[in-house]
Amino acid sequence: MHPVLRLSEDFLTDRGAVSFPALPRMFFMVRGAAMFGTRSLGPDEVWYSEDAVTVRAAESGATIWRWDLSLGAPAPWRNGPGVITREKLSVPLENLPAGDLLWRGDSVAFPPGGVAYLHRHQGPGIRCVVEGELRVDTNGHSQSHKVGRSWFEAGPDPVFAQAGDKPTRFVRVMILPRSLIGKSSIQYVNDEDRAKPKSQQYRVFVDTPLTLAGA
């Protein structure tokens, strides 16, 4: 059975609360504020844990993007009052890197018109646009992703990306070889692109060893 990476969106009204069972999981705060156990998070902040956690929204409510990794269907949980969950994307990871693994959660920002030259990554992942619009070209197909749109990249397939006419940013989770802790996973396809100035900027939220025992 292949591990499954899921991205869901949780909407919590004021004082809405939900308890999640133990799984490798990253929460990204889109709007509002919430308590993750005893820690308070606001917009653009992240919580990662493999342990069970209870999330409680502040009076402003909260919109949260949540990445989970599980072996098949995750353990069931029940949303409390004032909580609505919508699954955005779910993908079996059929070609995970061999050996020890790494969970990386980060964001990638582009100036208007900025590009990511044709490249690969060393593991699979799910992305979601939080600001602007990004065109992604891969395997002969081109798609434009606006705010809230998510997509999957397997890793080995070459990808070219270009931002629209506004600043653009997406958040992603990738499952990578553990040897890449603290290192970039990007591999440029064309030699001439390696030395070119790069317009994208990275912000790493989570870069930690991953075990599938709890999944």
Q: Model-predicted segments: where are they?
A:
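Short acidic-glycine-tyrosine-enriched beta hairpin
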Residues: E9-D14, M26, A33-V55, F110, ...
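Acidic/histidine-enriched, glycine/proline-rich intrinsically disordered or flexible terminal extensions
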Residues: S184-A215
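Ligand-binding loop in jelly-roll beta-barrel domains
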Residues: S40, E50-P81, G155-K183
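A contiguous binding-surface segment within folded domains or other stable secondary-structure elements
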Residues: A98-G148
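Surface-exposed beta-loop interaction hotspot
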Residues: W65-V115
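Short Lys/Arg-enriched alpha/beta "domain-start" segment
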Residues: M1-P24
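Short, conserved beta-strand element in jelly-roll/cupin
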Residues: A22-M35, F110, H121-V136, V173-P177
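Short histidine-centered beta-strand/loop micro-motifs
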Residues: A17-P21, T38, A116-H121, A161-G164
